[in-house]
Structure formats: structure tokens, C-alpha cells
């Protein structure tokens, strides 16, 4: 029994299947963890969702910003951008089934035995694990309810960008969503910066990558995340695993076998013909 962690798939179905074949992933025996952003930009978002859904209890995933944007398009809130290549998914006969399944997926995965936490963008250093759990549940409850379009319409935006237990309503939900799915850089006090996308070496002072700011979760747990392809899986402290290596941009799809920390990569089938972008407003 092995646990495989794979970075952002972004609709790269062929690469995902090739990578799982390479590691001899066996559903029912092994477990697959996915860092979110299953869809958009690659050509196979429909096949990715169908396959991941079919894995049942053999998969543990978290939602990413592109997944949330897809749900907003599905709900009629945001427009379908051609570059996201989502039309085959949105027009599929099983679209309702797939997307209603998708909106019931979590923002946070935790394995206490492995001391492993996974979120799409990471864990803000302003949270301890209990707070992260409670915050994830808040958004998950709204997404799985009948009022989810109201939340999706309000999730776009950069404020508030500083955590407070006193946050309420849509502002609280927006901060939680941004922290779990869009975060890259923080100010030294942990306040989110939602504008900078440079490499850590090029970021303006005093910004630091979220994982470079001490936080209570990273003190006790390993953290796996995706979202930040320009890191190329490098430059993180011990116990912090950056798994998005830009498959949809012409990079690779990366898999970490947890038990022995061995990495496997599958080269992209695409040329790097576009720069990194985001579907959710950043």
C-alpha cells in the first residue's frame, strides 16, 4: 500500500495516466492525493474529472482556484474563457453529475498518522491546524449547499487579506478561499499579498513566500501544496513539498511517493506556448 501525491493536473489527462502507470498505482490498494486544479488549460479536463471521480475512496483531493472558477462558470457567474478549454466538460452529458461531485470536495486534507497536511496553495502561517480545519469546513459547507452560487459570485476579490477570528460573512469566506487556493507571498506578519507572482528571489521586500514565515502548522506537520508552478518544486524548507511543476505550461507532472519520498515525473505533451496565468482573479 503506497500513497502517491501528485501536483496540479490542469486537464493533462494523458500525462496523469502515464504517470500513474509509471508508478504502478493500484486503486483499492494505493491512495492518490491530488493538490487541486484538476481542470483548465490542458485538453482533457473532462477525462480527468471522470477518472478521478471513478477512483472513489482511493483518491483524496483538494479544490484549487481553477476548480472553483469552473464551478462559477457552471453556475453562470463567470464566463467560459477559450484558453481554459472547458467547453467539452461543460457540454458533457454528465457535467451536472461531475460538477456537483466536484463542489463537494474539500479544501484541506489531513493524515494524522503521516503528519501530512495538503491544501492547494498551502497553509497561512496565521492559522493553527484547528483554525485551518474550522475555516475549511466553513467554505466546504457553503459549497455543498444549495446557496453555493451566491458564495461563488462573492469569492472574487483580494480583501480582506489579514486573518482575524472576528471576520464574518462573505469577507471571512473570501479570505479563507484566498488563503487555501491563491496564496503565494505574505508580509512578515502573515498578511496575504495577492498581487505578486514573481519567483521568491524577485519578490519585492518585505514579501516572503508563505512557507518562509514560521507558523504553527509547519512546526508539527508536513505540508504538501501545488498552485505555484514557477517554484518548479524547489526552494522549500524541509517538510514542505511543492508539487506543481507546470505540466500544462510545458513542464512536468510530478508525483511524490510518500513512504520513501521518491519523486517521479512525466514530461508534458504540450509545448510551453503560454505564460502562467490564473482563472480566479488574482
Swiss-Prot record:
Gene expressing this chain: apaH
EC number, UniProt record: 3.6.1.41
Species this chain originates from: Escherichia coli O6:H1 (strain CFT073 / ATCC 700928 / UPEC)
Annotated protein name in UniProt: Bis(5'-nucleosyl)-tetraphosphatase, symmetrical
A molecular function GO annotation: bis(5'-nucleosyl)-tetraphosphatase (symmetrical) activity
Catalytic activity: P(1),P(4)-bis(5'-adenosyl) tetraphosphate + H2O = 2 ADP + 2 H(+)
Cross-referenced InterPro entries: ApaH, Calcineurin-like_PHP_ApaH, Metallo-depent_PP-like
Record function comment: Hydrolyzes diadenosine 5',5'''-P1,P4-tetraphosphate to yield ADP.
Annotated PANTHER family: CYTOCHROME C5, PTHR40942
Subunit structure comment from the entry: Monomer.
Lineage per the UniProt record: Bacteria, Pseudomonadati, Pseudomonadota, Gammaproteobacteria, Enterobacterales
Stated family: Belongs to the Ap4A hydrolase family.
Keywords, alphabetical: Hydrolase
Amino acid at each position: 500500500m503506497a500513497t502517491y501525491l501528485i501536483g496540479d493536473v490542469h486537464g493533462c489527462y494523458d500525462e496523469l495516466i502515464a504517470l500513474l502507470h509509471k508508478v504502478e498505482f493500484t486503486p483499492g490498494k494505493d491512495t492518490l492525493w491530488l493538490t487541486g486544479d484538476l481542470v483548465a488549460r490542458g485538453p482533457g479536463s473532462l477525462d480527468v474529472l471522470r477518472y478521478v471521480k471513478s477512483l472513489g475512496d482511493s483518491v483524496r483531493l483538494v479544490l484549487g482556484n481553477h476548480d472553483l472558477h469552473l464551478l462559477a462558470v457552471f453556475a453562470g457567474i463567470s464566463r467560459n474563457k477559450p484558453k481554459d478549454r472547458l467547453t467539452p466538460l461543460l457540454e458533457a452529458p454528465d457535467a451536472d453529475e461531475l460538477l456537483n461531485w466536484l463542489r463537494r470536495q474539500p479544501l484541506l486534507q489531513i493524515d494524522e498518522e503521516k503528519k501530512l497536511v495538503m491544501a492547494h496553495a498551502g497553509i497561512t502561517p496565521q492559522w493553527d491546524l484547528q483554525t485551518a480545519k474550522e475555516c475549511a469546513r466553513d467554505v466546504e459547507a457553503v459549497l455543498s449547499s444549495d446557496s453555493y452560487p451566491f458564495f461563488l459570485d462573492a469569492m472574487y476579490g483580494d480583501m480582506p487579506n489579514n486573518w482575524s477570528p472576528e471576520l464574518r460573512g462573505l469577507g471571512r469566506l473570501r479570505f479563507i478561499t484566498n488563503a487555501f487556493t491563491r496564496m503565494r507571498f505574505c508580509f512578515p506578519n502573515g498578511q496575504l499579498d495577492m498581487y505578486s507572482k514573481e519567483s521568491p528571489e524577485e519578490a519585492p521586500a518585505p514579501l516572503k513566500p508563505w512557507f518562509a514565515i514560521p507558523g504553527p502548522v509547519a512546526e508539527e506537520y508536513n505540508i504538501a501544496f501545488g498552485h505555484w508552478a514557477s517554484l518548479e518544486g524547489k526552494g522549500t524548507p524541509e517538510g514542505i513539498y511543492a508539487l506543481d511543476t507546470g505540466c500544462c505550461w510545458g513542464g512536468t507532472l510530478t508525483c511524490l511517493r510518500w513512504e520513501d519520498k521518491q519523486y517521479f515525473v512525466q514530461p508534458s505533451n504540450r509545448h510551453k506556448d503560454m505564460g502562467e496565468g490564473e482563472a480566479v482573479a488574482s
